Amino acid sequence: MKAERSDVDRAHAIYTKGNLALYDWWVLGLSNQWIWSCPTEKLLDLYRAHITANHLEVGAGTGYFPAKTMPSAQPRIALLDINRNCLEKAAKRLAAFRPEVHQENVLEPLIIRGERFDSIAVNYVLHCLPGRLDQKAAAVFDHLAPHLQDDGVIFGSTLLGLDIQRPL
């Protein structure tokens, strides 16, 4: 899937340094519980069940979830985001783990050197990308698959609009 550059830029423009300063409080503290009816603790459980010590975090956000759930004191953690503000915020939070930082567009083929990952999180990413859910999900997973170990796991969550039929 090839998204127009302006569409991609608009999709992540909200993640300014100022907005990221409030993100954990607003999204993880209030919105998850009261607007989306999915308490942050449920997402932490998802991470605890699937994150490994060889992990790629797609859509770095603030680094909250890997910071709270990393199963190793010396992991290999990589952050991938198109937004420099998110990468800086998450890398600062995860500095003790010395994260790899990749500023790339997940809707395009990715260049990530080194061994493949045992876990890849795509959390709160798909709804931020431009385009139809089926097309952007296919593109994202096609671009991540070459970077996942054969027995690895991709996990995450997204927000669905009212017009999306939910399988669960």
Set out the residue ranges of the language-model regions.
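Helix-to-beta-strand junctions that scaffold the AdoMet/dcAdoMet cofactor pocket
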Residues: 129-130, 148-150
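A short acidic, Gly/Pro-enriched loop at the edge of an enzyme's catalytic core
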Residues: 110-120
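A short, conserved alpha-helix within the catalytic core of class I
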Residues: 129-143
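Residues lining the SAM
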Residues: 123-127
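Conserved class I S-adenosyl-L-methionine
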Residues: 1-50, 153-168
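Class I SAM-dependent methyltransferase SAM/SAH-binding core
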Residues: 54-109
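Class I S-adenosylmethionine-dependent transferase superfamily signal
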Residues: 69, 143-144
